[in-house]
Amino acid sequence: MATRSLLAPPAVTSGRTGSPPTFSVIIAAYEVAPIVHAAVESALQQTLRPKEVIVCDDGSSDDLQAALEPFRDRVVLLRKEHGGEASAKNAAAAAASGDFVVILDADDVFFPERLEAIAEAVVARPDLDVITTDAYLEANGAIVRHCYDGRWRFEVDDQRTELLRRNFVFGLVAVRREVFLRHGGFDESILWTTDWECWIRLVLSGSKIGCIDAPLALYRLREDSLSARREEITRGKIMTLEKTRRDSRLSDEERAVVDASIAGYARELALLLARRSILTGGGDARRRAIAVATGPRFGWRARVEAALMALAPRRAAKRLRRREEDSWVGAGGIRVRRESSGDPDSSIADAHT
C-alpha cells in the first residue's frame, strides 16, 4: 500500500504498544434494507479483514434480515427496539470485541484499503484514540468533492479549542472501544450531532484524533438522508454546545469560545427559520426577516437576503422555491444541483461568522 500522510497532534507517551489492532465495523440500520448491501460488502472486502461486522437493527419495519442474507454467517445481526441512531451504535459497540469500533453508515462505503491504512496509523501512533480519513462526497452518482478540500480542514494544532467551534472530524471514524465505552459512548439524548458531542467529550478527557490524508471512503449525500435536515441539525449543534458549556473541565477562555459558537449557530438557525416562514407564509415571516437583517454579527449576504424577505416577501419566496426546485442541501451545508454537483450555500456560512 502506498504511503499516506497522517495528520495528528504531536505524539505523547501513552503507555500503549504499537501492536496491530483488531477492528469491529458497526452499522446502525433503520429502514435501510434496499441500500445496506454495498456498505456491508465494502466492510467485508477490506484488505485487512475486520474481526467482525455488526449490524444493529434499530426496530426497522423492513426486511433487513433478507437484505443481509447474502452475507449470512459473515455478519452479526443485533435487534433492538427503535431508540435512534446513537442508541443503535452504542448497542453495537457494547457487543463488539475488536480493539477499535469502526463506524460505517448504511448508505456509505469503505474503499478496500481503509482498515489497513488505519491499522498502520495505530501502529505508528498508539497515542491516538480516534482516527478518521478523508473521503469522497457523492451526490446524484457523481463526486462532488473531497471531504477535506480546503473549505473544511482537519485541525492538528489545537484540537481542544477548535472542536468547540466546529466538528472537524469526518464521522466514519475508528475509535478505541475501551475509551469510547469508558466515557459513555454517544449521548442518546442529543439528535443529529451526537458524534460531535462525543468527540468533544473524548478530547476534553485527553484523547487525540488523527486523520489519514487520503480519500478512503465514499460518503453519499442524499436529499432524503438524515443529514439533509438543516434546522434540526443546527438545533443539535446548539444543544451539543450548551451541554459542553456546563463541563467543569473548560477554562474561562474555552467557555467564551463555546458562547461565541452558540451565538453563531443561533444566527444560522434564525436565517433558516426566516426562510421557512417566508416559504410557508407564516405570520411571523417579516419579523424574523427583520431580526436577521438588523441583528448584530450577521454577515452581509445574510443581511441582504433577509432584507429582501422583509421588503418583498413574495419575490423572496419565489426565489427560495426556485432554488429548492433546482437544488438541495446535504451534509456540511453543501448545496447540490438536482442533476449535478454544486457549491456550498454561502449565505448560511455567512450567517454563522
Task: Describe each region flagged by the PLM.
Residues 2-235:
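Nucleotide-sugar donor-binding/catalytic module of glycosyltransferases
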Residues 4-15, 209, 221-353:
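C-terminal subregions of glycosyltransferases and related glycan-biosynthesis enzymes
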